[in-house]
Amino acid sequence: MPEKTQLELDVVPAIKSLAELAKVENACARCPLYKDATQAVPGEGRRHAHLMLVGEQPGDKEDLAGKPFVGPAGQVLDRALAEAEIPRTEVFVTNAVKHFKHEMRGKRRLHKRPNAYEIERCKIWLELEREMVKPAVIVALGATAARSLLGRPVTITKLRGRRLELSDGTAALVTIHPSFLLRIRDAADKKRQYAQFVADLRLAAKILAKDAARAATRRVA
């Protein structure tokens, strides 16, 4: 595995596979977050998945496991995907930032939101994942993911439920991060927000199906 000092600069070696990309990500020292994290957490899923989900960053459990969305937020995501009839095995899941940013509170490691510099420094890895997977639709889970993908700060409520287009033409949607649902105390509000989250995932599947049908029609014509 490359030493961290090898990847402090902006030059990234040629990468041919997701497994190779994961190793290079784990050697990343492009921002200081690697110093306090256990490891980088690369994306995971089908190499040519049609749907990519992008979260903010790994949480405590993800940092320890080295896999994305395996903690409480991941459980919410799995349930929502199932209700939207989207097999997680058919999806590529990743994060805008690959290292866990946190602060110590006693013996606990509490999440801290990545800043603009950290998001930008980590963007190269997300772009390489997108280049390799080539998803037809990308769903940004939360404001950090949306900022990384769109290149600007966004307000989720203003963009939610709308089909967007990234600079390369890829279809994109913006929704909440599943961890947001874990923080809602009011039961009625939590139920409503969860239903909307599932609806957002269903919309992504609908866009996928519609675009695939349109492409098939063009081939026949």
Where are the model-predicted features located?
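A polyanion-binding, active-site-adjacent surface
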Residues: 2-221
